[in-house]
Amino acid sequence: MGKDEEEMRGEIEERLINEEYKIWKKNTPFLYDLVITHALEWPSLTVEWLPDREEPSGKDYSVQKMILGTHTSESEPNYLMLAQVQLPLDDTESEARQYDDDRSEFGGFGCATGKVQIIQQINHDGEVNRARYMPQNPFIIATKTVNAEVYVFDYSKHPSKPPLDGACNPDLKLRGHSSEGYGLSWSKFKQGHLLSGSDDAQICLWDINATPKNKSLDAQQIFKAHEGVVEDVAWHLRHEYLFGSVGDDQYLLIWDLRSPSASKPVQSVVAHSMEVNCLAFNPFNEWVVATGSTDKTVKLFDLRKLSTALHTFDSHKEEVFQVGWNPKNETILASCCLGRRLMVWDLSRIDEEQTVEDAEDGPPELLFIHGGHTSKISDFSWNPCEDWVISSVAEDNILQIWQMAENIYHDEDDAPGEEPSKAS
């Protein structure tokens, strides 16, 4: 009986998800300026835009690259991948940025093929938990593997099609962890300085400029203070000696490399009531850091007074796994959760007055809910070149590249009552 009930519940949930998706699809033209949906062969647990952008002459699109990975079934090979994406130019005629009903795509060029192409596959041992490029040289990509080591690849030194023997040949293997994890962060100040956090409760720091032995490097420094899994690590974006970490022990820790003790963070706070899964420092305001948690909330903290949160965002209905600041707008933050939703927040709208009707959609700072995914979102990335464009990947193999409609974030001049409703 129990199994039948479980199956029925699963079927009902699937039906609800499909209904929600149909409603989302129908509303896409009103809520978005761009939606590209691409089915990958395997799910990717990671996505990150690369910083370069080209405009081919005579074309109505720009070309950018992004990093993806695979999470295949047991016997299938895994890859670190590079994809090339065509994005319509802003001044493209509106009929060219048309809505493609069959594919629920908005911002196509009258031709749906070839907008996302996998241009390079590099053999990888096991799934790619996370992949991030080095800011000073985007050819260099670090990956979190399932075997505790962190791999470093220079993708310019690898062929576009992987060797058929399936051999994984990273340019460097970074040692120091005893188990896998997800936390990974390159220093924007010190070329080659890489932080990693894992399930072994440790944070490792490497300098990849050091001389390797047999393509292997041991950690330059290991930081131990978390009591349990280190879920995420991040370098501060203004001070080269500061970084933060969060973990299953519910703590947010701030570390200072100038401190004499590697086991003592300079600041610590119990940030959430459950595991803390992610953190992100604000790129404009040196004091502000955001965290996301299994307790379904996103919180803002001020490094000058870490003991109490500045603000709590509590609209998510499931555990929050990723947070990320808009690289061009100081007050814009995005977060995604287990519940298939990616939310975009505007801090400048906190405590704004609302009508009763608007309040039903969520708090004033909840700017937008992206409802295009039908399973858990694994990762997302703000586009560094195209304002307000986000790419997101989910467990059902879907990669989406999207941009909310301009009138949603530029609505200061709207008459009362004309404010666009939030998507969901």
From Swiss-Prot:
Could you tell me which PROSITE patterns the record lists for this protein? WD_REPEATS_1, WD_REPEATS_2, WD_REPEATS_REGION
Q: Which Gene3D superfamilies match?
A: YVTN repeat-like/Quinoprotein amine dehydrogenase (2.130.10.10)
Write out the residue ranges of the motif DWD box.
243-258
List the GO biological process terms.
Answer: DNA repair; DNA replication; embryo development ending in seed dormancy; flower development; heterochromatin formation; heterochromatin organization; leaf development; pollen development
Ranges for the WD repeats: 123-163, 176-216, 225-265, 271-311, 315-355, 372-412
Q: What is its main location?
A: nucleus
- Let me know which tissues express this protein, per UniProt: Ubiquitously expressed. Strongly expressed in floral buds and flowers, the female gametophyte and the sporophytic tissue of the ovules. Also strongly expressed in developing embryos following fertilization.
Q: Does the keyword Metal-binding apply?
A: no
User: Mind telling me which Pfam families this protein's record contains?
Assistant: CAF1C_H4-bd (PF12265), WD40 (PF00400)
Q: Which UniProt keywords apply?
A: Chaperone, Chromatin regulator, Developmental protein, Differentiation, DNA damage, DNA repair, DNA replication, Flowering, Nucleus, Repeat, Repressor, Transcription, Transcription regulation, WD repeat
Instruction: Spell out the subcellular localization from the entry.
Output: Nucleus
Recorded GO cellular component terms are: chromatin silencing complex; Cul4-RING E3 ubiquitin ligase complex; DRM complex; nucleus; protein-containing complex
Which N-terminal stretch is annotated as signal sequence?
A: none
Q: Which InterPro entries match?
A: G-protein_beta_WD-40_rep, Histone-bd_RBBP4-like_N, WD40/YVTN_repeat-like_dom_sf, WD40_repeat_CS, WD40_repeat_dom_sf, WD40_rpt, WD_repeat_RBAP46/RBAP48/MSI1
Q: Does the keyword Repressor apply?
A: yes
Q: What does this protein do?
A: Core histone-binding subunit that may target chromatin assembly factors, chromatin remodeling factors and histone deacetylases to their histone substrates in a manner that is regulated by nucleosomal DNA. Component of several complexes which regulate chromatin metabolism.
Q: How does it assemble?
A: Binds directly to helix 1 of the histone fold of histone H4, a region that is not accessible when H4 is in chromatin. Component of the chromatin assembly factor 1 (CAF-1) complex, composed of FAS1, FAS2 and MSI1. Component of the FIS complex which includes at least MEA, FIE, MIS1 and possibly FIS2. Interacts with EMF1.
Q: Can you quote the domain comment?
A: The DWD box is required for interaction with DDB1A.
By sequence similarity, the record places it as follows: Belongs to the WD repeat RBAP46/RBAP48/MSI1 family.
Question: Mind telling me what this protein is named?
Answer: Histone-binding protein MSI1
Q: Which organism is it from?
A: Arabidopsis thaliana (Mouse-ear cress)
